[in-house]
């Protein structure tokens, strides 16, 4: 899809923000076909103009962005990019919108005239392009507030069937949060996994994401702060703005470190960094799972995991909102299994079964 081929609707109750966002997109050649000041008029604009992508504010009078996102998914399915305030309640509302089917989110531009505004514009435009290319049909399950345990196809197994001290690294980006949540919710505690989650997400949101995963999973999930040692039954989420490195391994416990090294694949945290350091350090069963997302992050890392004797599972195209990261991983030739979203847990568990 060329820049000129992308049509956008901008929904925000602030005229100032509508102007800022519209100007950013217009400058990049993305056509803003309509703007709206509340959710109801936003839904109508989407119905009328049939855009490729919607940028959606959350807090608006009348119909808010969460309800509007749900209505759009029900009535005229269109990729939605949530523009979220950087605050605790903003993070929670953002995840509620993603439950309704929003593909991704972006921290709302401050609107301040500063040297950082150009970088904000570049990041917003990249997000809009990514979301515009998303397959909304692949994310429709998210709009039903996934009750994954009720619909899980995960095969029942006994604890004695699993290998000892397995480690799982999950990497995802666009469209990933609800898929990660479903995957973790379907992994039994009996598997005794040590889990690292690298989701492309800014600081201020990864902590809330970890809390959601903790509530959805049998595993104890927290945001990495650096220096932790985790064992079986525990999971860490990479903190936004930091790479998550595996810096040591002993007695079945992982030690992790956060670094502010340069972005890799234009992102930080990068899946490749975690996978490559895990491949170097983990002396035990290691599995990588590459989920929906734009770009090639994780492709180099899965080669390292495979070379170290580990296993690789990737999400299939049909259920990926953006089949970028899984496709690039598959193209390396080292992926052992490709599974749809509701079979990813089974795919992971198959890699840690005793022979």
Swiss-Prot record:
Residues 7-123 form the Response regulatory domain. Phosphorylated by CheA. Phosphorylation of the N-terminal regulatory domain activates the methylesterase activity. Residues 161-355 form the CheB-type methylesterase domain. GO terms for cellular component: cytoplasm. Coiled coil: none annotated. It catalyses: [protein]-L-glutamate 5-O-methyl ester + H2O = L-glutamyl-[protein] + methanol + H(+); L-glutaminyl-[protein] + H2O = L-glutamyl-[protein] + NH4(+). InterPro entries: CheB-like, CheB_C, CheY-like_superfamily, Sig_transdc_resp-reg_Me-estase, Sig_transdc_resp-reg_receiver. Its EC number is 3.1.1.61, 3.5.1.44. This is Protein-glutamate methylesterase/protein-glutamine glutaminase. It comes from Natronomonas pharaonis (strain ATCC 35678 / DSM 2160 / CIP 103997 / JCM 8858 / NBRC 14720 / NCIMB 2260 / Gabara) (Halobacterium pharaonis).
């Amino acid at each position: 899809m060329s820049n000129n081929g992308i049509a956008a609707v901008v929904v925000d109750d602030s005229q100032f923000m509508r102007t800022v966002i519209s100007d950013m997109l217009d400058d990049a050649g993305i056509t803003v076909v309509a703007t709206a000041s509340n959710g109801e008029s936003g839904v109508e604009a989407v119905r009328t103009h049939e855009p490729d992508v919607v940028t959606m504010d959350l807090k608006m009078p009348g119909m808010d962005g969460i309800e509007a996102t749900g209505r759009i998914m029900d009535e005229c399915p269109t990729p939605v990019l949530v523009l979220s305030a950087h605050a605790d309640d903003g993070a929670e509302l953002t995840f509620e919108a993603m439950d309704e089917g929003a593909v991704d989110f972006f921290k709302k531009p401050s609107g301040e005239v500063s040297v950082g505004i150009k970088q904000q514009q570049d990041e917003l435009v990249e997000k809009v392009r990514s979301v515009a290319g998303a397959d909304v049909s692949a994310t429709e399950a998210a709009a039903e507030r996934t009750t994954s345990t009720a619909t899980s196809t995960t095969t029942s197994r006994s604890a004695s069937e699993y290998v000892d001290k397995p480690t799982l690294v999950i990497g995802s980006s666009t469209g990933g949060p609800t898929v990660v949540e479903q995957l973790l919710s379907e992994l039994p505690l009996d598997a005794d996994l040590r889990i690292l989650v690298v989701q492309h997400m800014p600081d201020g949101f990864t902590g809330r994401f970890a809390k959601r995963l903790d509530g959805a999973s049998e595993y104890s999930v927290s945001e990495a702060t650096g220096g932790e040692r985790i064992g079986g039954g525990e999971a860490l989420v990479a903190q936004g703005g930091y790479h998550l490195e595996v810096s040591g391994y002993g007695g079945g416990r992982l030690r992790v470190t956060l670094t502010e090294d340069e972005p890799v694949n234009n992102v930080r945290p990068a899946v490749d960094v975690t996978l490559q350091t895990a491949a170097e350090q983990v002396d035990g069963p290691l599995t990588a799972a590459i989920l929906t997302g734009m770009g090639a992050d994780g492709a180099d890392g899965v080669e390292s995991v495979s070379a170290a004797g580990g296993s690789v599972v990737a999400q299939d195209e049909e259920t990926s909102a953006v089949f970028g990261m899984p496709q690039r991983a598959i193209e390396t030739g080292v992926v052992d299994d490709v599974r749809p979203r509701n079979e990813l847990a089974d795919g992971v568990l198959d890699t840690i079964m005793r022979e």
